[in-house]
Swiss-Prot record:
Substrate binds at R71, S72, G73, N84, L88, I89, D90, M98. PANTHER family: DEOXYURIDINE 5'-TRIPHOSPHATE NUCLEOTIDOHYDROLASE. This is Deoxyuridine 5'-triphosphate nucleotidohydrolase. The keyword Hydrolase applies. GO terms for molecular function: dUTP diphosphatase activity; magnesium ion binding. It comes from the Bacteria. Keywords: Hydrolase, Magnesium, Metal-binding, Nucleotide metabolism. It catalyses: dUTP + H2O = dUMP + diphosphate + H(+). It comes from Photorhabdus laumondii subsp. laumondii (strain DSM 15139 / CIP 105565 / TT01) (Photorhabdus luminescens subsp. laumondii). The gene is dut.
Length: 152
């Protein structure tokens, strides 16, 4: 299923120096977001920084949202993950996409202008309506959690 999402280019380098986000393969779920920087940013161990992507989006469909997720290689190889772990973009948001990066590693890491720093994935939304009850219908699991089902 393909859905059109309104994207506004805020930084004129996008489409010129930095490519527009595209799906890498037909099976890709995420589009890479790039750091729209004038100069490289060095992240010291433990440091967080809010980086612009140069893109604004308006999803405009209440049945969709977007999540900003880390790129696996940055986290696994360099210890750089999202500062808020996951970013949620609501359908009515119309501002610039910003990415909070956090260096949880023990070495400084430099982010270059145009470097891919995160990915955005569009997801369906179900808005819940709470139904107040006194008790739940009994299930096999019950209230067991946090390892209740074992390790193997």
């Amino acid at each position: 299923m393909m859905k059109k999402i309104d994207v506004k280019i805020l930084d004129p380098r996008i489409g010129e120096e930095f490519p527009l986000p595209t799906y890498a393969t037909p099976g890709s779920a995420g589009l890479d977001l790039r750091a729209c920087l004038d100069n490289a940013v060095e992240l010291a161990p433990g440091q967080t920084e809010l980086l612009p992507t140069g893109l604004a989006i308006h999803i405009g469909d209440e049945q969709l949202a977007a999540v900003i997720l880390p790129r696996s290689g940055l986290g696994h190889k360099h210890g750089v993950v999202l500062g808020n772990l996951v970013g949620l973009i609501d359908s009515d948001y119309q501002g610039q996409l910003m990415v909070s990066v956090w260096n949880r590693g023990d070495k400084a890491f430099t982010i270059q202008p145009g470097e891919r720093i995160a990915q955005i994935v569009f997801v369906p939304v179900v808005q819940a309506e709470f139904n107040l009850v006194e008790d739940f219908e009994t299930s096999e699991r019950g209230s067991g959690g946090f390892g209740h089902s074992g390790r193997q």
